[in-house]
Amino acid sequence: MFAELQRRRESGRVFEKHAFATLRDLFRWGMRGADGYQQLAETGYMLLAERTRHARDAETVRDVLQQVMRVHIDPEALYDRADTLAAQLGPERLAALQSAAQHHRIVWTSAMRRLVCLTAAALQQNEPVLLVGETGAGKTSVCDIVATAFGRPLH
């Protein structure tokens, strides 16, 4: 996986100069755990592709994951499936997030589900999270939901 991404980076200037997946990223991926290749590939996509700045780089990561692991990843449906969220977060944490979203009167758009899933999965592994985006994108709401669900303040 790492070797193929590295090869594509060198041949096509994918991931720009400094935005490439590091060994640290791969270790983080390994620490997340998975039940089968499909879940492993989806977790890898969440960790590697979602941090890219360009859609073509995310597509390259998806292509490599699908080629190496022989699975299919549908980024559009990835965060809309309850089984993906439950696998990433656990059924109890998913229920807590849904309850917190109702409490905060959040509408579960696909962008909001994606942001909540990525943020909660990182925090569950005690990984730092930096939310950057346009005003009104839902960053504060995501922090409120996740803080309520995890029962701890976020800074």
Describe every region a protein language model picked out:
Residues 124, 128-155:
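Walker A/P-loop
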